[in-house]
Regions:
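Short acidic, gly/pro-rich beta-turn/loop elements at beta-sheet edges
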Residues: 93-94, 219, 271-275, 381-383, ...
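Generic detector of solvent-exposed, compositionally biased contiguous segments
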Residues: 56-64, 258, 368-370, 374
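Flexible, charged surface loops at secondary-structure boundaries
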Residues: 140-141, 200-203, 406
Length: 448
């Protein structure tokens, strides 16, 4: 378990400070005052926001009791293949004695009717299926999810829940250890002041910087900084060389000072690149929007952004970013991660898709990078999801989605505002504030 408190003045996104917490299973919760999370249950099928499935697909949701338990889905030591291991007490009758491995895209909820198996193995109570990863090719499986099936009457019958590769760091050529910061003191930095002595004078050793991803996309906006053509997974992407030069300057300057960097990936609206906005988020009016990992065009761009940033910011030439936060206060649905109203399970699942995508992309280049979700201080207020969800409820739902499809070491970037936010003496709370902030896992608010 890694626990670090980053005190960041995040005026741009309205965050005074946050606690970063990372654990393999999130066994304990923020600030060290909570006892734990109940064992998650299989993801429940949600209703209204689900797209209707084509008749030419094999559903992998709502299929009843799973016949196969997946034990692991990991990159093998050679770095070119992965292995999915599983077990079952028995198998249904089928056309042959084989188990088949089928691949699905991040955005798919069902196996296409014309799917071709990528591996097969004999039916055994303990089994392993191996296939090529094909990293950074048009057929890459780094971001895919996989199901085990048998063939029945010439069609594939899915026996397992989808599973992603859970150790993308095995592909990374950069594996320097996570740095130990000299101090927890940090700032959201102003690039115009990086040339001054302010960071040194203040003793800052942690820094955060916002990356609205649509700024990266498109041709350069300055003749001195050529447009960057980045090829990933067989496709070319046009990136703004002028914007990239800004990030180069910021991250290189901070790295040279021995400052641990946190990049906050935000999904701003761009008329030129609507595909990065989730289909349930278009037409809204907010600061930032939900990432689109629900459609092919969106996932392609998000994969390319994740790969470019992680590949570029892992060396001394451009600076080293070790912390990546996906979105800002995503439980505040209407403002910071806009999506039209959906139930919390649907919302969590769509966010989990995006986090998983960034996780696999970033860690495939930087093995010890850390990836976080972002929640605010409204822990257990029984909020109406017309605008926001309680942080605890969303974290539980998100954790359920992640564990169901292959557990990973995600972290929590928590924003522990004082309550009320205009009250600076957070250690002296009386009246309503004293009732809202308690040392209990059922507290309404979690503050510093």
């Amino acid at each position: 378990i890694y626990l670090a408190v980053l005190l960041l003045i995040l005026g741009v996104i309205g965050t005074a400070m946050f606690i970063v917490y990372q654990s393999e299973n999130i066994g304990k919760q923020v600030a060290g005052i909570f006892e734990g999370i109940e064992e998650v249950q299989p993801e429940q099928e949600s209703g209204s926001a689900e797209a209707e499935q084509s008749e030419k697909t094999h559903s992998v949701k709502g299929t009843g009791e799973r016949k196969v338990t997946i034990l692991s889905c990991e990159v093998l030591p050679d770095g070119t293949q992965f292995a999915l291991k599983g077990e079952a007490d028995a198998f249904p009758e089928s056309d042959d004695n084989n188990l088949y491995l089928l691949a699905m895209k991040t955005y798919e909820d069902a196996v296409p009717e014309d799917a071709v198996p990528i591996a097969r193995a004999e039916k055994k109570t303990s089994f392993m299926l191996k296939a090529d990863i094909l990293d950074n090719t048009a057929d890459s499986r780094l971001y895919s999810k996989f199901v085990v099936a048998v063939k029945k009457d010439g069609k594939y019958e899915v026996l397992s829940t989808p599973q992603y590769i859970t150790n993308p760091e095995a592909l990374a050529s950069y594996s320097e250890p996570y740095p130990k910061a000299e101090s927890i003191k940090g700032l959201l930095v102003d690039p115009q002041k990086l040339g001054t002595s302010e960071l040194d004078d203040l003793g800052v050793k942690q820094a955060a910087y916002n990356i609205p991803i649509a700024r990266l996309l498109g041709p350069s906006t300055h003749s001195d900084y050529p447009t960057i053509i980045y090829n990933y997974n067989g496709k070319d992407y046009t990136l703004n060389g002028h914007v990239v030069s800004e990030y180069d300057y910021v991250f290189k300057t901070l790295s040279d000072k021995g400052i641990v960097i946190t990049a906050i990936l935000l999904n701003n609206k761009s008329d030129a690149y609507p595909q990065v906005i989730h289909p349930l988020s278009r037409g809204g009016n907010a600061y930032y929007y939900a990432f689109n990992a629900a459609e092919e065009a969106g996932t392609d761009y998000l994969e390319a952004v994740a790969a470019f940033l992680a590949e570029r910011y892992r060396d001394e030439e451009h600076g080293i970013v070790m912390n990546w936060i996906i979105g800002n206060e995503v439980n505040v649905r209407s403002t910071w991660n806009y999506m039209k109203y959906v139930d919390i399970d649907t919302y969590a699942r769509e966010y989990a898709r995006a986090v998983r995508l960034f996780y696999n992309g970033i860690k495939s280049f930087n093995a010890n990078a850390r990836i976080y979700i972002s929640l605010d201080q409204q822990w257990n207020r029984n909020l109406s999801s017309d605008s926001s969800y309680d942080s605890r409820d969303l974290m539980d739902a998100f954790n359920e989605c992640i564990k169901e499809e292959g557990n990973i070491q995600w972290g929590l970037a928590h924003h522990p505002y004082s309550y009320p936010m205009t009250w600076p003496k957070f250690w002296e709370l009386t009246g309503e504030a004293g009732e809202m902030v308690q040392e209990s896992e059922d507290t309404s608010m979690v503050t510093i």
